[in-house]
Amino acid sequence: GWIEGFNQCEAAMTARQRRRLTAIFLLLAYVHTEDEFMPVVTMLSGHPNFLADVKAVPPGMTFLFPDHAQAPLWADMWEKCVELNTRFNTRPAVKTSDALGGRWTENLGTYVWAFLRPSLRTDFLLKQYDGRERFLSPQLADVADWLVNALSAPFDGESPAGYQNLLAVDYGREWGVLAPGKGPSRVHPPQGAHSEQRIPPRSLWYLGQCLRRYAPLAAEHAMWAARPKNQDMEAGANSKEPWDLMYQGPENRGTNPHLRSRKFTGYGIVLRSAVDTRDELSIHLQQIDEGPNYRWGRAGEGGCGVLYFYAAGKAYSYTGPEDVGDRDDQDTDFCTTFGVYKNGEFRSIGMNVLSRPTYDLGPGQFTEIVPRTGPSSYATPEYLSRSVLLAGHDYFVLYDSVAHQAITHRLTWFVRKGDELPSIQLLRGAAGNRESQRTELTTPSVAGQWFDGIGDSLAVVSHRKDIKAEGTAFGCRVSLPGSEDIVFRNPQPVTFAEGDLIFQGTAGLIRKTGAKIEFALFHGTRIGIAGLVFTTDDQDLGLGGAIVAGQAPSGEFFAPQASAVRITLPNLFSKAVFFVDGAAQPAHREAETLVVQLEQGSHRWELSDTLPVPIAPRIVRTENFAGGGAVIIEPVASATRYRLELSKDGGSTWATVDEQPSPTLKAGGLTESEKVHLRVIALNAVHASPPGPEYPLYVSSQPPAPPDGLRVALATGAATVGWGEILGATEYLLYARSGNDAPFQLVYRGKERSFVHKKEGIQACDAIPGRRTRATDASMIEYYVTTLDGNGESVRSHPADTDPASWRNWDPKPGERFRRVNSFEAGSPPESSEWARYYPE
């Protein structure tokens, strides 16, 4: 590249060469700074990876020519570009649909990395300029979490046949692909244009480095997910380049997040089971929504409805680099999906918001996506929904519901050419008549099958070869060695009674395994096992659990909204108390029935006439001191003591280091500069909880580092000052002064990471930044923040101020959140936009 080329060759240049090249480079900086090329002031131009490329030019000149008068302005301008680019291109969390934020506008397969790679390189250059970390925003922490949670179950590597075929037909796309025998490693599914199933590039690790003094847990998880020696985006295997300097430093393997099933706004759902074991599997169900999107694929309105399945170290579905990318093919041609025959073509489910709940109830999991309705409908009214019901870590039931049973459909499944398909047992929608046909297809990249049928489709899919399934009117029966399952899945409610097993609803599971009975009610009004019956009027209340001889019945529930359940108790449990998260719940008792009000959200329940099992406690923070740290945890109900465990090998083995009745524990006597992990177990007289999430502790006797990301949001008479988080901090101290010669005064001290400083004379930001000289009068306030822990106070952070002309303080739309539409007229009614302008809070 030209930055590293100039940097490397400058010493050998003649004076004339240096003058001419310097003039050319500075001209490039001037051209790329203003709004004539990829504007930022009058509009936020895109796509975001283009903006990252273009706006990287001026800060590159800051690195090459640090004494240039415009060098500070170019650095500040780039920082603001990062802030705006991430603010308006990162899908937010949507609490009403229990969806997390972080999905980037551009596709996972290629273009999120096309944004990150040049941005991270620019950030590296600017850190050489003045040491300030600029690649920061709350949204970047969310992006890191999304990139981590989008990873598959551990993958052992491509099959020899599949890998040889890849090298032969898709040369140039193989960067990041895991060669045979090189696993296990987690990979991203091949989603969008130019995609492959790849290990995350080293950019993710470096993003973690950027976030360490801002969003440290997101940083830890990113460094766990990617390694500094991973192949970079589009880099050749074992290639050497100047940017390798970015990835040198002490070994740090981050912190294991112990991935769980997750839903992400505008992306889809990832279901997981048996995480961190050899039985781990993951199912990735994709559905993007209307709004800023780039290169997610032409087929299926961006791959909507496509499914990816990883289990037992293998990939059991695959999409070629452009098959749901830039190729002009139809929705169901070369991917794992489902389509209804509509207007002369098979249509997948199409774009829509993720409005249906996702359930992770232990024995079973369930998720569902639906098509959009209205004038812009794509698959309605013919297509109703696509759902996945996951039973343990053994198999899943894929159900596609259509409007009536005469609609022609196509279920498709594809793997990499040379790989094997999973076990697919079609139990509904494939009756053997003329509409039921199977077509085998092979392209240079993929091999797969079309299953054409009519009406609803129910398929039992598994990586296991010893699975047997039988279709029924209520769904299916599934047999595995050692277990018998009854799966309830039907668009219309079914009523089932067999011995002491009861079910009423549309989606559920009952599993018998020896002396254990597990159950899950996803959508319905009633489920009963062994005389224990749960009844509800809320058909979206999800409730699962297990009955094991000699143990109290227990499980999980998820209530999208506050709800109620009626529990019929056999004599054995007639004196039992209903506990939620270890706390006894008020209940109305009627004979052998308890009526309990359930709070919104995901919770653990237990029916017990003794003490319940406490839930796993979470470490809130640590407070460092020489040789260790205090560990502050969130107290949990029913716990009388807490046990602190420590690991020195990244969580492989654990040893007890403290046990106390209070939710503050200590780990001491540790070696200087070592990194350890901590976790806590809650105890009472009868039970111990599962271990809580692990938390990193960096042992030091030195004062801490200051936080990164000190920024100011201006308004008339007030400045909202915010900063990042430091692991091990006891509290933060914010200092301010007015005028360059005045002493700094402490204006805030505490654990919060933002403070509203109200003072007369503070001005709102200018409408256009950088158009007047820096304010120097006494009304301008300068800030810095420090960190305090048991070892003392840190040095000062990089400063911030209230200069209304500064690029760093400029905000074109104060307070505006992620916008789903590109533009709208001021004052126009919301319904004038093509779709909702904003997600609900």
Language-model features: locations:
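Aromatic-lined, polymer-binding surfaces characteristic
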Residues: G1-L151, S823
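Extended polysaccharide-engagement surfaces of secreted carbohydrate-active enzymes
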Residues: N107, A114-V580
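C-terminal beta-strand-rich structural cap/linker in extracellular carbohydrate-active enzymes
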Residues: Q449-V460, A591-P612
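Short beta-strand elements bearing conserved aromatic residues within extracellular beta-rich modules
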Residues: A576, Y642-L644, Y732-L734
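Short beta-strand segments within Ig-like beta-sandwich modules, predominantly Fibronectin type-III
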Residues: P586-H588, T656-P661, L746-K751
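Pro/Thr/Ser/Gly-rich low-complexity, intrinsically disordered linker/stalk tracts
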Residues: P612-A637, E672, H687-G728, D777, ...
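Conserved Ser/Thr-centered positions that define the repeating blades of beta-propeller domains
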Residues: S647, A736-R737
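Beta-strand-rich modules
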Residues: A667-H687, H757, G761-S794
